[in-house]
Amino acid sequence: MIYEFASAENIGDRKEQQDRVVVMSHPTAADVVLAVLTDGMGGHTGGALAAQSVIDAVVPMFEAFTPAAGAADDWLRAMIMAANDKVAAAGKGYNRDPRATCVLALAQPGRINWAHCGDSRLYLFRDGEFASRTEDHSLVEILLQQGKITEAEVDTHPERSKLFTSLGGAEPPQIATGCIEKCRPQDTVLLASDGLWAYFQAREMADLIGYRNLTAGCDRLIGLARKRASGNGDNLSIAMIRASAPIKRGLIGTLFRSRLVEPSPLEDARRFMLNYLRAISGPVADDLTLRIEACKSGAELSAQFPGAAEAVEGQGGAAQATFFVQRVKELLEEA
């Protein structure tokens, strides 16, 4: 198994870029890849200093990592603890109070281990669908786990940015770890800062990256997040790693060409609408699904839009319908 990877970042509408992201293969093992994404916390002084300190601590440790030695979880924990110490030391040296969040993914043949602290997230997409994500170290995540708010309310909750752990503080950081075992071809992990994930539901992310090469997927998500921020967006950063079957001799040209073929905006809109309707099911949704599958133009798809929006509102409520309408309008405008 081999891994493709890509990353991107954007300053958003802030004066300073306080996110950092690095994705790299191991210097002695091309099939071992590390992604590290860190977000310097804007509520403290020295956010950019904190984020850069994380990178400065983690990258040399990865370069010294021996893939065959030790448990990956232990290595990732050690990397985050080293980053924590470096952030704290940087604060003392510059008389500041830097803090940062961090998420790491370590891909080795057949598995991907991850670790995180704070609200920078890792998502897993499998078979073109959202499978799981890390749980934020935040008050809002606790409310979600207690059933007091919904997943859709997390992104816009007024307390969303309140974390109970981070790197660089007086207390040792809380670190969560996990492993995606028996990776399948096309399994994709996506790392994102809150400046990016706040603008998307996980199901929409799956639609946007499922049939794209990784660089195009990163660019598309950042572009849409910037559009939705309407001039008041945070720093954004994203990294992706995708598992691929080894390329056989003679198939390289075909595979390379196929990865360059991007779906049209019309196909994006069709797939987005179909995914929503299949999720709610029922006679009305099933009939709309057949109609949308038969659409061959933007005009035909637009004609089915009002009925689809009504069906989504009937099953998912006003909040889901509002999101559905906004996203479909964006896609149809592009088509």
Description of each model-found segment:
Residues A245-A335:
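Long, compositionally biased terminal regions
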Residues M1-D268, F272-N275:
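PP2C/PPM-type serine/threonine phosphatase catalytic domain
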